[in-house]
Amino acid sequence: QDIIDYCNEQDFPLLTTPWEVHMADLIKDFSMRCLYSQKEDNEISKLFQKAFSMPQLIEEIRQQLMGAFDVDGSFQVVLIGIEDSDQFDAIERRRVAFQLELCFEKIESSYAFFWFDGYFVLVVNNLDSEILESIIDKMYKRTKKRMPSRFIHLGIGTQMHDLHQVILSYKRAKAAVTMAEQFKYPMVLFEEM
């Protein structure tokens, strides 16, 4: 019981299994689930990238995203620019993405997180703006602590309703992050520009 209490206090995941379950089978199953989840995340990321670069295909994309997102709900895009990120190799980019994504575990709605056009992109679906701002604030502080030598800029787009409008939130986030980079602000909300 002491171990369970300690793990709960530290927010450390504890896996308990019955004795008859073989650890090798459990690890294999868990690994397969992780691989499948990563593949699904990559496909969703590609769909959002397509939506941003080819908005005329939004109806086709809408059909493909229906299983994972409420396409009639609200969408909001956040762009995260990190100083000199254009010089990151794939391993460094993956390491930074992992650090950023640790902060998103509290998001209880559908979201996508990926690298696109020089920025880390977070697309959230049906998430209250106050909760998003709290998560972004936590992520910013954590990133500054983990990477003190790099300046981080955030651009937060407007919350839009329906998948058709996600491109507008993306463009507004891009304008906001561009302003943040230009004036050396850590964070700019499009609505406050």
Label every PLM stretch briefly.
Residues Q1-P18:
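Extracellular/luminal Protease-associated
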Residues I44-M193:
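Hydrophobic helix-rich structural segments at or within alpha/beta enzyme and signaling domains
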Residues M23-Q56:
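Juxtadomain coupling helices with adjacent low-complexity linkers
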Residues D2, D25, Q165-L168:
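An acidic, carboxylate-rich microenvironment
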Residues P18-W19, E192:
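Proline- and acidic/polar-enriched loop/turn elements at helix boundaries
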Residues P13-L14, R33, D84:
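Charged, low-complexity surface segments at secondary-structure and domain boundaries
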Residues Y6-N8, S31-L35, K171:
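Short, hinge-like loop/turn segments at secondary-structure boundaries
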Residues W19-E20, Q159:
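An acidic- and aromatic-residue-enriched active-site/binding cleft used to recognize and process polar
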